[in-house]
Amino acid sequence: MVELESMSSSSEWFLNNNSNIHNNTHNHNHNNNNNNNNINSNNHGHSANSSAHNHNNNNNNNTNNNSNNSNNNNNNNNNNNNTQNTNNGTFLTPLPVLTNSSTGLGKSIDWLYTNTSNTDSHNINSSSNKVTKLSNGFSLLNQDGTQSPSCFLNLSSTGNHEDPVQVPMNNNPQDLLFQFNISPQLQSQNNNSSNNNNNNNNNGSNTPLNGSNGSNNNYSSPISPVPQYQHSAGSSPIQEYPYYSPSSSPHSNESTSPITVIKDSGSIINPINNNNNNNNNNNNNNNNNNNNNNNNNNKNNLNNNTFQFSSLKSTTGIAPPLQTDYHLLYNFVQQNFSGKPEDSLLNQTLNNNNNNNNNNNNNNNNTTIQTSPQPLVLPQIQNPFLPYNISTPISVPNNILSSAQSSTNSSPNNNNNNNNNNNNIFSTVNNNNNLVNNNSNNMELDVDKPFSQEKFYLHLKSIVPSFNENFEASSESAQSESSQESDYDALNERNSGVKKRGRDEDQIDTSGQVVLSREHVLKLSSKEIEEYVSRLKMHHILTQAEEKELKKQRRLVKNREYASQSRSRRKIYVENIETKLQKTNQDCASIKSQLNSVKEENKALKKQLYSLTNTLKSNPSLAEAFGKIFSPIGNNKTSSATLFVFFFLFTFTFLFQSSTVTFNSDRVSSIQRNLLSLEETQATEWNIKRAILEETKQYVDSLLTSLYTSKLQSLSETPLDTSNYIINNNNNESTSETTTNNKVVSTSSDDISNVLSNLSVSDKEVPQKCKDSSDLKCDSPPLSPLN
């Protein structure tokens, strides 16, 4: 019986543990007086106003309770200080219960209910008394031992399993009691434990609801409901009648509470006997134990978790990995059991952290603490039913943290202890916050660094695997890289048929084997349509109507091409005019700018001229000096005569050269003058003189030639004296006429020259000194050179 009870409690504890992850289960430590063995009894989920019972035997000293109730913090010495902590929560969707037909576990654990509120712990010292059912559906502890509490668990030595007893809860508080009958010895032990805790409790601290004194053997206990649903159209199931479901857990860190009456709606009925003095003393004692309790929390968590998994493995044969994060347990339950644990698991994880652990010494005797339910909105978890990777860091959103902190602060008596209860969640959240902070710091560093396209694409590919670098290639570059062909080239393309208006990408068959429709024919060029018609006549016999239609189509195509060409020519003409107009506008603008500059310069020059004339008018002496510059040469006769003579001498006397006219070379020699060598003073003056000499020579030569020709004419008119030129016939008889004629001509030419010489120079005209050619000299001195 003990083995079956432990197995059922372990299986039910696992299912309830999935809804209460961080030590939110109820502690039921049933210690048997007879066998001196610590048995981990049943752990059952409860409603919003549920409670748990720790049955400890004082005779066994309960030395092993610290391992099972490690977070209860010295509950063995405070067994009588029973404080009930309740939260008004809502009923959640039940989890299907794991059944085991081999062990006889079945209908007694059909449904497991979880609550968003905290569970309760009750340390009740029990004995080996039996339980009997009352007429009103409740059970009573009797001394006869006719019935056993196993009737509620459907666990008996015979192996018969019955359905759990469903007891409806009425509004009458007297009907909501589950009474136990205890022995005087147990009551005395309870009184001794209360005195050891310095609570100064009188008999009223353990006074039952019927108002009897402390020696009464009856204890009242709230009944844990079992679900019953009533469905309405268009609404979710509503729980109306709670049922009893005793629960126990291998471990729990929950506070003990006195036995009180709780309504079905979750409201609280204050205990009948409340001793304020005892409450104050108890608070002082409890506050002293807070530090020790908080220090032991972290050490006990590992032992509790280990015990949970070992108990689970012994019961079901399977256990999740040793990790307390609610994501792992969530996925584990989803993989191994049917149902949806998200309603009971995730909400319980945070809401049940209030008033859960280390509250045994903080609460008053006979005081009921109620915490209002905190609304908790959990974010949507992506793929919650997939296996969760243990190595992946688990993150809790900040809104969960804020709701958990707000729910923690809702209980005024447990503010110092809830931080230790939420160590696992807060550490997970802190890790998540550290990751977020690290990511934000990395982002700030990346912003400060220069942008790298490769790193950005890699990061984007890691986020979006289907990302393609060429996907966002803008078509603007292709459009901007349009061809810069001239309009004449475009016109040639149109004429050649390369670019067609309305031409599809598919090539049109112009082989003539197939008769094309009107639409296809109109898409052809003039050359293509000519080829098409010629080939079509070769393969087909056309009627007159078809030929007329082809002619019309060909005419349309040509007209279209001509129109396009004319438009293109007109366009080109207009563009050329526009370019010329732009050029003329530019030239006009430049000319205007030059004209403006010239006007400005003219104005400036006029201003300078006006200023000079004004200065000359104002200064007459300056005007006279300025007028001498432009005055001509004086009108003196002497100066003009001397200048004329000098010019004449310079031209005809100083630079005169005798002509080489010699009528008789023996008698008359050319007149020669020996010119002195002139020193070159300046190159400019020498060049001027040289030019004047050349001109005078030409002039003198022209005069001499005219005289020479006139004299020759006069000589030719006078008769020749041929008496001296008779040919001796005796000596020259054998000569011919030709030779005689030549001689006559030669002798006649010599005679003419002699005659001319005689005529040109007569004895009368030539002076006595110059008769001889050898004595012909000039007695005049040489001219001095020009300065």
From Swiss-Prot:
<keyword id="KW-0805">Transcription regulation</keyword>
<feature type="region of interest" description="Disordered">
    <location>
        <begin position="186"/>
        <end position="306"/>
    </location>
</feature>
<feature type="compositionally biased region" description="Low complexity">
    <location>
        <begin position="473"/>
        <end position="483"/>
    </location>
</feature>
<keyword id="KW-0804">Transcription</keyword>
<dbReference type="InterPro" id="IPR004826">
    <property type="entry name" value="bZIP_Maf"/>
</dbReference>
<dbReference type="GO" id="GO:0035497">
    <property type="term" value="F:cAMP response element binding"/>
</dbReference>
<feature type="region of interest" description="Disordered">
    <location>
        <begin position="401"/>
        <end position="441"/>
    </location>
</feature>
<feature type="compositionally biased region" description="Low complexity">
    <location>
        <begin position="351"/>
        <end position="366"/>
    </location>
</feature>
<comment type="function">
    <text>Probable transcriptional regulator.</text>
</comment>
<feature type="region of interest" description="Leucine-zipper">
    <location>
        <begin position="605"/>
        <end position="612"/>
    </location>
</feature>
<dbReference type="GO" id="GO:0006357">
    <property type="term" value="P:regulation of transcription by RNA polymerase II"/>
</dbReference>
<protein>
    <recommendedName>
        <fullName>Probable basic-leucine zipper transcription factor J</fullName>
    </recommendedName>
</protein>
<dbReference type="InterPro" id="IPR046347">
    <property type="entry name" value="bZIP_sf"/>
</dbReference>
<comment type="similarity">
    <text>Belongs to the bZIP family.</text>
</comment>
<keyword id="KW-0238">DNA-binding</keyword>
<feature type="region of interest" description="Basic motif">
    <location>
        <begin position="551"/>
        <end position="603"/>
    </location>
</feature>
<feature type="domain" description="bZIP">
    <location>
        <begin position="549"/>
        <end position="612"/>
    </location>
</feature>
<feature type="compositionally biased region" description="Basic and acidic residues">
    <location>
        <begin position="763"/>
        <end position="778"/>
    </location>
</feature>
<feature type="region of interest" description="Disordered">
    <location>
        <begin position="723"/>
        <end position="747"/>
    </location>
</feature>
<feature type="region of interest" description="Disordered">
    <location>
        <begin position="18"/>
        <end position="95"/>
    </location>
</feature>
<feature type="region of interest" description="Disordered">
    <location>
        <begin position="343"/>
        <end position="372"/>
    </location>
</feature>
<dbReference type="Pfam" id="PF03131">
    <property type="entry name" value="bZIP_Maf"/>
</dbReference>
<feature type="region of interest" description="Disordered">
    <location>
        <begin position="473"/>
        <end position="507"/>
    </location>
</feature>
<keyword id="KW-0539">Nucleus</keyword>
<dbReference type="GO" id="GO:0005634">
    <property type="term" value="C:nucleus"/>
</dbReference>
<feature type="compositionally biased region" description="Low complexity">
    <location>
        <begin position="235"/>
        <end position="258"/>
    </location>
</feature>
<feature type="compositionally biased region" description="Low complexity">
    <location>
        <begin position="18"/>
        <end position="90"/>
    </location>
</feature>
<dbReference type="InterPro" id="IPR004827">
    <property type="entry name" value="bZIP"/>
</dbReference>
<feature type="region of interest" description="Disordered">
    <location>
        <begin position="763"/>
        <end position="787"/>
    </location>
</feature>
<dbReference type="GO" id="GO:0000981">
    <property type="term" value="F:DNA-binding transcription factor activity, RNA polymerase II-specific"/>
</dbReference>
<feature type="compositionally biased region" description="Low complexity">
    <location>
        <begin position="186"/>
        <end position="223"/>
    </location>
</feature>
<feature type="region of interest" description="Disordered">
    <location>
        <begin position="153"/>
        <end position="173"/>
    </location>
</feature>
<feature type="compositionally biased region" description="Low complexity">
    <location>
        <begin position="273"/>
        <end position="305"/>
    </location>
</feature>
